[in-house]
Amino acid sequence: MASELPVVESDRRLIWIDLEMTGLDTHRDSIIEIATVVTDAQLNVLAEGPEFAISHPLQMLEAMDEWNRNQHRHSGLWQRVLNSEIQHAQAEASTIAFLQQWVKTGASPMCGNSICQDRRFLHRQMPCLERYFHYRNLDVSTLKELAGCWAPSILDGVVKTSSHTALSDIYDSIAELRHYRKSMGTFAGLPVV
């Protein structure tokens, strides 16, 4: 989507981000895919950012654990990474350039599922992008954990369609938060709106 809306001070816009990595060890593993989406506060999609597979050598992909090797082969990300010429710095700069059209620096929390892990990787491999976000996180997985504790039936309506690619994971996270928003009263024992 092209930028059609100017950044307005009163708008509450949310930046959704997802990364695919070679594993979960922030000191050893690496970001291999990044995508972003901007929504308004009502979770309406305003813009879809660039989606990048980040170049890595075959030996780094082969060093991944079995789950990651199988998943990234199945999703097609493996081949996209091998074919890519995009480096971390290019993906970071292009993502920031996109976000600057939609959201002011520091105005949006980092939004997504298990987003603390993504923030750790960004801090190490894309620090300028990590600093673009507010220090707060909007982590959908927190609501999932709370629903599991307080109102497990809410989880029945969560449907994941993602292929474990960054962009599809973002859309799953947005859909999941929409589902929880409909059930917010249930968390506190209030009637569902």
From Swiss-Prot:
Top-level EC class as recorded in UniProt: hydrolase
EC number: 3.1.15.-
Active site: 135
Entry keywords, A to Z: Cytoplasm, Exonuclease, Hydrolase, Nuclease
GO molecular function, one term: nucleic acid binding
Subcellular location: Cytoplasm
Family recorded in the similarity comment: Belongs to the oligoribonuclease family.
Protein name: Oligoribonuclease
Organism: Xylella fastidiosa (strain 9a5c)
